């Protein structure tokens, strides 16, 4: 929705080697070497501060989402996603493989997964963002596998800058957002020092799926019709056949309030209206920076970043979610007609089939607590990071930079209106309407057998349950780097320029933990959570040493204007859980410039990423995964073949489907199933090899073209099989021809009562972590930038300049294999439960800016190619199994009224394009929401933002 679609600026990438007459010494993202000029042997591009201002984002991730090299990550645009965190994913290899830096230094991760929340980056102070997509483990550390996003802040700011913006949709006038930033800076001691303070406040309203016609009703991805959750109202029930009981009432049945009878099929509950397309946000930021030059050899500096973001997300009302309770057949709230049916099913004699009888029935209950209202997840995220350092010149053109940094990220999550499993069980064990059989803790008998409204406020007050979860991450980083050249004694005779080198030492320690209240630590006790959240803690240390070299080989010879070599190596010692491992990362590459306007470049790198705290120490817990069709559901199997070896019916029985449920097993509730996953302390580092080759061409002044091919191969990847892999490995004859119980079948844990993957009695599908995976991607990046005066078009030069840019990404392959026994899944051009959100073959942004004096107009065209549902799986509705190419157009306008006052206007999704509709279970739980992919497509609509900036 709010993606700016910024084109990567080409000022960095487009300059040929050593083309400047004056050698400016700078440091380039991707290396710690300070070299003349701003050249890189790997693809590197920039987003300027002006581009960021023009698009008026309220969060950093917004202008990243539209970049060709970026893949939308789960974030604020996903219901029940990341607790308000905004992350970056380059090349689609995962947010944990993209390194985020501020001024070349690490930020503390917000989670145990090692991912940085970009909400903590102050937009008001951004000077430039460098995106390095060639791997940078040698320069910055093991986790820079797919690339680096380096946010460079303004230096030595003076004066006052007050910026504010307000935005809303043009049709419904909702999803409002307000942002205000105040920045103050001043020089000290005859300009020897500078201090800056920037504070900001952002408030963004949430947008519910019920606010859009395409999101208000949950749609079945197979049939296209309305669907929902089996946890419904009136309640749905099922129970196993008892001794002497009848075969009727298999499957799920619902009480008809008019007759009191159990009828089938049960009506599903629409969970969409209360869920979010966009999560609301209240964020407060404060950033302070200072530097002071003590002498020519020492400049002290310090930075402090503080962010407090509060997010209140909602989910559909809580309920019993298919848990089984021991309910007396004489529970007074059971209608007489339904009681009679249950007695027949269980074989209970007529004498006992009366109100007040204590004979227990194991009853699977699916009651939605609509009387309780929505579930709330309140997140309070606090990040504090401070850095102290010293830098300066050593002598002989060598410089140093030493710093220490500590960051803390703390999250408090409060769950409200979720309900207690134990209290529901106690309240259902009642023989009259006023007291429970176990009448402790103020127990109030619960009526789950009536229509909406049958649960009274007193009942709700008893069964209600809130929960508290705490998370803390602390990161300490100590770093020393020195760089310079080796002088004119050790030079190539064909170049005459010194070798530039950089040495760096770094020590990093990450300590992380979670804690929760007693209720949260019990499996299923907090209704609707699906998993316990036991306390956990872990830490790891890294000690690293690196060396980099830039070696000029040839200069100013025929067809060899410049040939340069770049080498680097990083040695890492990784320590965790009392064990240590040593491994290395390296890079080798160079450039050849035959003429001034043309430069070829290539780089090969090996990156080694250590597993993060979550991958190592996360406990094994039961969560949720999407699944539209259970291989054993409905008439796919039959009781006649239940004992016939080699049949699907027999295999379903052997993997946990009771014979009485064969032929009537319902579809997964809400299109979701239980999924057992967790960390693995035995994990080792994964290895990635990155290759890039390309060229930079400036055929004429102010026109630049870059073309780069990239290939990234990850071995020993930390990965886990998808639920689809496990289910196919067991039930699909392509992988299990004999339909016998195999290793995949051993990872399946069905509900012991009804055979589904839902309810507290089901562990679900196990997806363990290992180092057995592989992942690779390759493609081509093309960037073009051209600036021309309109006089070249035959117009008067007073009509200003046109800036044209085009950024294009063609992905050639995108494959992964989580284990050797899994299939190698090629997700390019597909979306599915296994592949996740759409994986585009092509993306491009075309941006045109027209500047006339104090006015500027901007036009941005964003394109993503068409995708289809991954073949070979569930037969989804054809209309949902294909998404055509999408085009978005954004506009912007700037008026510099005076030197002090600037006015901005931006319009995103000018044509008010609606998102593609795919239903609710065709993708993963995190990406497929509100019948679409809201992180990949605009689910909000045309959005207009007004802004103003005052400087003095």
PLM region descriptions:
Residues 623, 804-896, 911-912:
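C-terminal beta-barrel architecture of Gram-negative outer-membrane proteins
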């Amino acid at each position: 929705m709010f993606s700016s679609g910024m084109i990567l600026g080409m000022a960095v990438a487009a300059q040929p080697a050593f083309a400047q007459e004056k050698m400016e010494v700078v440091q380039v993202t991707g290396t710690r070497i300070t070299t003349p000029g701003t050249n890189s042997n790997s693809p590197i591009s920039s987003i300027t501060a002006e581009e960021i201002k023009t698009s008026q984002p309220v969060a950093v991730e917004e202008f990243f989402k539209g970049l060709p090299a970026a893949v939308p990550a789960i974030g604020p645009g996903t219901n029940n996603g990341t607790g308000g965190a905004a992350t970056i994913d380059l090349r689609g290899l995962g947010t944990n493989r993209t390194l985020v830096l501020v001024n070349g230094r690490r930020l503390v991760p917000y989670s145990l997964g090692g991912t940085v929340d970009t909400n903590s980056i102050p937009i008001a102070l951004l000077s430039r963002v460098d995106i390095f997509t060639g791997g940078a483990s040698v320069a910055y550390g093991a986790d820079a596998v797919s690339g680096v996003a380096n946010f460079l802040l303004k230096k030595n700011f003076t004066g006052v800058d007050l910026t504010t913006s307000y935005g809303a949709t043009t049709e419904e006038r909702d999803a409002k957002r307000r942002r205000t930033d105040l920045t103050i800076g001043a020089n000290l001691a005859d300009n020897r020092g500078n201090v800056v303070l920037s504070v900001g406040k952002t408030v963004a309203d949430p947008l519910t799926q019920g606010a859009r016609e395409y999101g208000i009703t949950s749609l079945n991805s197979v049939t296209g019709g309305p669907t929902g959750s089996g946890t419904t109202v009136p309640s749905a029930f099922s129970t196993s056949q008892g001794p002497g009981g009848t075969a009727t009432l298999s499957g799920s049945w619902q009480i008809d309030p008019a007759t009191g009878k159990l009828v089938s099929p049960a009506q599903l509950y629409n969970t969409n209206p209360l869920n979010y397309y966009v999560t609301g946000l209240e964020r407060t930021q404060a950033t302070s920076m200072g530097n002071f030059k003590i002498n020519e050899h020492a400049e002290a500096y310090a930075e402090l970043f503080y962010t407090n973001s509060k997010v209140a997300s909602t989910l559909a009302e809580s309920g019993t979610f298919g848990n089984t309770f021991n309910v007396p057949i004489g529970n007074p709230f059971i209608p007489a007609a339904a009681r009679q049916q249950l007695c027949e099913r269980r074989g209970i004699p007529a004498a006992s089939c009366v109100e007040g009888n204590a004979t227990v029935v194991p009853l699977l209950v699916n009651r939605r607590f609509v009387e309780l209202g929505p579930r709330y997840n309140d997140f309070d995220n606090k990040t504090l990071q401070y850095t102290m350092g010293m830098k300066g010149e050593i002598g002989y053109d060598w410089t140093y930079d030493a710093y220490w940094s500590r960051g803390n990220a703390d999250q408090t999550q409060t769950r409200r209106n979720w309900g207690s499993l134990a209290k529901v069980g106690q309240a259902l064990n009642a023989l009259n309407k006023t007291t429970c059989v176990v009448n402790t803790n103020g127990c109030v008998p619960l009526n789950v057998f009536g229509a909406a409204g049958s649960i009274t406020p007193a009942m709700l007050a008893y069964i209600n349950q809130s929960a508290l979860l705490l998370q803390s991450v602390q990161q300490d980083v100590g770093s020393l780097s020195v760089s310079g050249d080796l002088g004119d004694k050790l030079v190539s005779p064909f170049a005459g320029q010194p070798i530039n080198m950089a040495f760096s030492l770094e020590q990093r320690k990450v300590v992380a933990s979670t804690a929760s209240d007693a209720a949260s630590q019990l499996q299923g006790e907090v209704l609707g959570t699906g998993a316990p959240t036991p306390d956990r803690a872990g830490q790891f240390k890294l000690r690293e040493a690196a060396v980099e070299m830039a070696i000029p080989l040839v200069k100013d010879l025929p067809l060899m204007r410049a040939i340069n070599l770049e080498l680097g190596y990083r040695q890492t010692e990784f320590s965790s859980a009392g064990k240590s491992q040593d491994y290395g990362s390296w890079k080798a590459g160079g450039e050849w410039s035959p003429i001034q306007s043309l430069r070829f470049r290539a780089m090969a790198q090996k990156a080694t990423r250590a597993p993060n705290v979550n991958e190592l120490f996360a406990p094994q817990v039961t969560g949720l995964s999407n699944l539209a069709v259970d291989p054993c559901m409905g008439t796919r199997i039959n009781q006649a073949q239940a004992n016939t070896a080699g049949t699907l019916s027999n295999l379903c029985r052997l993997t946990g489907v009771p014979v009485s449920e064969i032929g009537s097993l319902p579809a997964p509730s809400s299109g979701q199933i239980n999924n057992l996953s967790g960390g693995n302390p035995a994990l080792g580092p994964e290895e990635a090899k990155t290759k890039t080759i390309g060229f930079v061409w400036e055929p004429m002044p102010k026109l630049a073209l870059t073309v780069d091919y990239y290939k990234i191969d990850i071995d020993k990847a930390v990965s886990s099989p998808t639920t689809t892999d496990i289910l196919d490995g067991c039930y699909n004859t392509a992988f299990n021809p004999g339909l016998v119980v195999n290793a995949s079948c051993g990872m399946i844990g069905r509900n012991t009562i009804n055979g589904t993957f839902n309810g507290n009695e089901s562990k679900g599908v196990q997806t363990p972590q290992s180092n057995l995976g592989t992942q690779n991607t390759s493609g081509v990046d093309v960037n073009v930038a051209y600036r021309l005066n309109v006089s070249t078009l035959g117009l008067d030069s007073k009509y200003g300049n046109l800036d044209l840019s085009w950024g294009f990404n063609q992905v050639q392959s995108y494959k992964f294999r989580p284990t050797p026994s899994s299939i190698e899944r090629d997700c390019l051009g597909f979306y599915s439960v296994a592949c996740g959100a759409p994986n585009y073959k092509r993306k491009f942004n075309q941006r045109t800016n027209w500047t006339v004096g104090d006015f500027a107009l901007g036009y941005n065209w964003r394109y993503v190619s068409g995708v289809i549902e991954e073949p070979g799986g569930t037969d989804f509705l054809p209309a949902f199994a294909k998404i055509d190419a999408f085009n978005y157009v954004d506009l912007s306008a700037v008026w510099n009224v005076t030197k002090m006052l600037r006015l901005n206007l931006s319009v995103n999704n000018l044509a008010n394009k609606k998102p593609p509709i795919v239903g609710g279970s065709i993708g993963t739980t995190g990406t497929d929401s509100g019948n679409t992919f809201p992180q990949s497509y605009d689910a909000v609509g045309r959005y207009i933002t007004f802004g103003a900036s005052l400087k003095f």
